[in-house]
Structure formats: structure tokens, C-alpha cells
A protein has these predicted regions:
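An active-site metal/cofactor-coordinating segment within enzyme catalytic domains
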Residues: 1-40, 49, 92-112, 116-117, ...
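C-terminal active-site rim and adjoining tail of enzyme catalytic domains
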Residues: 26-28, 104-180
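Conserved, mostly hydrophobic/aromatic
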Residues: 16, 34, 46, 74, ...
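Acidic (Asp/Glu)-rich catalytic clusters
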Residues: 33-41, 61-67, 86-89, 123-124, ...
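Surface-exposed cleft-lining segments at the edges of enzyme active sites
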Residues: 20-23, 47-51, 63-72, 128-129
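Structural preference for beta-strand elements that scaffold enzyme active sites
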Residues: 43-45, 71-75, 91-95, 128-131, ...
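Distinct, well-ordered alpha-helical segments
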Residues: 54-65, 81-92, 106-113
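Helix N-cap/beta->alpha junction signal
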Residues: 50, 78-79, 134, 159
Length: 180
């Protein structure tokens, strides 16, 4: 988004605020600034990107969200984020992001990534919806969850053709850079 190498946590807030978004004059807003700008005008999805088994970011964001009056939901690939919200903020809509990780070369042979692909942790996290990569719509666990009544969402649809191809497999769609 900014043409800079590294992860967000590699930089200080001051360094991040100097970076420009997509070759524009816009800078990266803090989450607090984002909430003030949105101010309940539109619903939003907050995706937690946990790269380790700790939920401090959930606690910090929740402090800013607990008095927010607008509509939002959270989603994450990491089941611990959903588990944290189930325990501390059960009224917040939770979504499990998923795909068939075991198909990726870097995860081949990983037991953890295989069980994540098959939504095994849903027993504990009890997500309100499952957001599965549309390229893996045939995943048996995703299909079972849908048959059992789980709201089935897909990401990220980038064309009208992808949307049409997936209409029967999913209930809701997350679009990215798409004009229908």
C-alpha cells in the first residue's frame, strides 16, 4: 500500500505517519482516527492479522471500540482472535477467515495449517460466519458448515465472472477492486 518493505510492527508510529498511501498525499490513519472519520456512517469489517498466539491487539482495539456506536464485525484467520471476542465481547459478530492453507508450498506437511483449513477450531470459537477463499469453495468443512446453517461468505471477488461463478456456493461476498 505504501511501497515500503517490512511489516507494520517494524516501524514506529511516527515513521508510519510519514508514509504515503498508493502514491497519494494521504497518510496512514491511526485506528482511532479511522473510527472518528467513519463515525458510524458505514459498517466496517475489522480484520485482525495475528502472526503469533497472543491477543493484545484485540484488547487494545476493543478499548477503542467499546463505546463505538456504529456497526462493525471482526474477522481473522487466527482462531485466537475469535476466541478472545467470544469470551470478552460475545455480542460482536465474529467471522473465521479461511482457505486451504495446506495447498500452499510453504505450509505443506504442516499439521496446524491443515486443521486450520478444515475449520477444526470452530468448535471452540463458534464464529457467526465463515469467510472462505472462493477458489476453495469445494472444501468439505466449509460445505458442511453451510449445510448446518452457518453464514457462508467469500473473499475476495475481483470480477463479475467470479461473482456469478460463486453465487450458489456463498451467501455474502467481499469484493476487492471490482466494478460490477
Amino acid at each position: 500500500m505504501c511501497g515500503v518493505e517490512g511489516n507494520v510492527w517494524d516501524y514506529t508510529l511516527e515513521e508510519l505517519q510519514q508514509m504515503k498511501l498508493l502514491n497519494s498525499n494521504q497518510t496512514i490513519p491511526t485506528f482511532e482516527d479511522f473510527l472518528k472519520i467513519v463515525d458510524g456512517k458505514v459498517p466496517f469489517i475489522l480484520e485482525y492479522k495475528l502472526d503469533r498466539p497472543q491477543t493484545k491487539v484485540c484488547e487494545l482495539a476493543n478499548e477503542m471500540l467499546k463505546n463505538y456506536k456504529g456497526v462493525y464485525c471482526i474477522e481473522s484467520f487466527h482462531p485466537l482472535a475469535l476466541l478472545w471476542y467470544r469470551k470478552h465481547r460475545p455480542e460482536v459478530l465474529r467471522g473465521q477467515l479461511c482457505e486451504e492453507f495446506f495447498r500452499e508450498e510453504k505450509y505443506k506437511g504442516s499439521f496446524l495449517m491443515t486443521i486450520l483449513s478444515f475449520l477444526v477450531f470452530n468448535v471452540a470459537t463458534r464464529p457467526d460466519f465463515i469467510a472462505y477463499n472462493h477458489l476453495h469453495a469445494g472444501n468439505i468443512s466449509r460445505r458442511i458448515c453451510k449445510v448446518m446453517g452457518a453464514l457462508s461468505v467469500t473473499y475476495t471477488i475481483k470480477s463479475l465472472e467470479e461473482y456469478k461463478r460463486n453465487q450458489k456456493n456463498f451467501d455474502l461476498f467481499i469484493f476487492d477492486s471490482c466494478r460490477l
